[in-house]
């Protein structure tokens, strides 16, 4: 197909989203540096982008989770129970690492507004009480008010109920999920313009301090991911196979992680992972199920992103967090991460759910999401590399452990 009369459209469709975001980020910095008055005016573009994210996020969570549970095949978990356990342990461990790192190296963000009417929770009891009330919220009201905890509860409940529905109904839910995901992708395609407006207005108002905040946040995020990849995951694998895990870890990072870093899609990396599993000589009936499932629920990188950005908002707003609440955040971040698969910007769009634990309003939470898009050039690539390479790593660890048991018997 050629575009002789539309060279700009041809350029946009052929250029990667990452490249376009980089251009938007640089353009925003240049505009803020040389024309600060104009930079403040284009901030409206960023506001439109954030509003679009706010509009699509509740529907996305509701439809995606409901369709995913409704279309889950019966008996799938019985074949991969050890791998499923590794996925869950790995994701929760990543969230715990992110909590510890966020307290050790707290990040502060430059937000447009700090609402004075906020009422942060007083402790774990108040958080749990608020959580229960959010769970039993009216589903329509939950969607309208962006009550993500209520949305998640209703999506899980309806998903379980629809598992017993006809194939036609479940196919309809799957098509609905695909339709919503397509709308999300369209919104994400406007990320370069949104980032341009956000960066320009932010730096025109706050100057280099905002850049320092983003740099610190990015270092914490990438540091957590590297720590999980080279310390936590090898420790989990060692406990499973009882031998040096690093040859396997490095193989997975090299063969799977590098590809995922550039594709920025766990789903797109599934064929690469399946081929790697075949080369490693793993059991086909196992990895043919565990790899696609891992691309759905094994989201250590997403758990890190959700936790670090949520606690960055908490620190910025001066909200005190006790240990039980931090543990609850780790659990919530892990659950959120499992629902972030296959969606452009999925982990970022689930940040408001985690923020709601601390009474942070949706307006502020979506500003944090926008910050996430600014640093997503590296964050999303590193997150996908960690997620996808861990799919193969834990699958291989479980298979090797089963072989060790069989040989010892």
Curated annotation (Swiss-Prot):
Membrane topology type: Multi-pass membrane protein
List the InterPro entries: Na-dicarboxylate_symporter (IPR001991), Na:dicarbo_symporter_sf (IPR036458), Ser_Thr_transp_SstT (IPR023025)
GO MF annotation, one: neutral L-amino acid:sodium symporter activity
* Thylakoid among keywords: no
Principal place of residence = membrane
GO BP: serine transport; threonine transport
Among the entry's GO cellular component annotations, what is one?
Answer: plasma membrane
Per the UniProt record, which residue ranges are transmembrane? 17-37, 49-69, 83-103, 142-162, 180-200, 218-238, 301-321, 331-351, 357-377
Q: Which domain of life is it from?
A: Bacteria
According to UniProt, the reaction catalysed is: L-serine(in) + Na(+)(in) = L-serine(out) + Na(+)(out); L-threonine(in) + Na(+)(in) = L-threonine(out) + Na(+)(out)
Q: Which Pfam families match?
A: SDF (PF00375)
Which key words are in the record?
Amino-acid transport, Cell inner membrane, Cell membrane, Membrane, Symport, Transmembrane, Transmembrane helix, Transport
Q: Where in the cell is it found?
A: Cell inner membrane
Family per record: Belongs to the dicarboxylate/amino acid:cation symporter (DAACS) (TC 2.A.23) family.
> What NCBIfam families does the database record attribute to this sequence?
PRK13628.1
Q: What does this protein do?
A: Involved in the import of serine and threonine into the cell, with the concomitant import of sodium (symport system).
| Protein name, as recorded | Serine/threonine transporter SstT
Q: Which organism is it from?
A: Pseudomonas aeruginosa (strain UCBPP-PA14)
- As recorded in Swiss-Prot or TrEMBL, the protein's gene is named sstT
